[in-house]
Amino acid sequence: MKALSRSLKDLSMEPLPSRFEKALTLIDAVHREDPQVEVVEGIARPSEALYAERMSAWVERLQPDASELLRLAVRCQHLRRWAIPRDRYPTGRLGYHQWRTAQARAHAQAAGVLLRQAGYDEASIARVQALIRKERLRQDPETQCLEDAACLVYLEYGLPGFAAQHDEAQVIDILQKTWNKMSPRAREEALRLKLTPHARALLDKALAGT
């Protein structure tokens, strides 16, 4: 009986998870629902779970003192992305931008639901949602940090596969647009990336034309 009392006492003294920890748990659980998988070192992982981890890692590197709300926005960047497939929208640039806009709104709405469950106030939720929608890019340092992380994740992990599926001119065009969205600090990091020889050659060509 005394042992049980001690164990219950110890349990009651354990710190409760913070609202930030609760939010991350909820967010990551949603990411694990992604039906698309990526194999890394022989292990199949949900693609969006991997993306979220990579985004968080880059923000930690770019801005070690990043605010709690920026960290949450970064983690929510592709929340339930698979629920709105690209083929719902017309082909071409206009359809692509319509899809991206719909995605950003959906990610922000889904994030709001989870953050309320975790105990965040409406002002904090609104700030996270604005970051997810990338509002005031270039004017807002936190929005720029999120965008930098997204660009670096693309260059480090997405570029080789994209380059294999598209013609060189299209890839170079995308790389130039990506580069134009990045801050000077992010560009420095990009130049230090260990890219495949083909990806590096494409990036060099893109930068030569900027």
Name the predicted role of every residue range.
Residues 42-70, 111-118, 123-126:
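Alpha-helical phosphate/pyrophosphate-handling elements in metalloenzyme active cores
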Residues 89-110, 166-192, 199:
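Divalent-cation-assisted or electrostatically stabilized phosphate/pyrophosphate-binding catalytic cores
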Residues 74, 121-152, 156-159, 163-166:
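Histidine/acidic-rich helix-loop-helix segments that form or flank divalent-metal centers
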Residues 39, 85-88, 144-146, 190-191:
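Short coil/turn segments at secondary-structure boundaries
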Residues 193-210:
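Long hydrophobic alpha-helical segments typical of transmembrane helices together
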Residues 1-12:
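N-terminal amphipathic/basic-hydrophobic helices that include classical n-h-c signal peptides
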Residues 19-56, 89-98, 102:
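Active-site flanking loop/helix segments enriched in acidic
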Residues 68-87, 91, 107, 111, ...:
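His-Asp-centered metal-binding catalytic motifs of divalent-metal-dependent phosphohydrolases/nucleases
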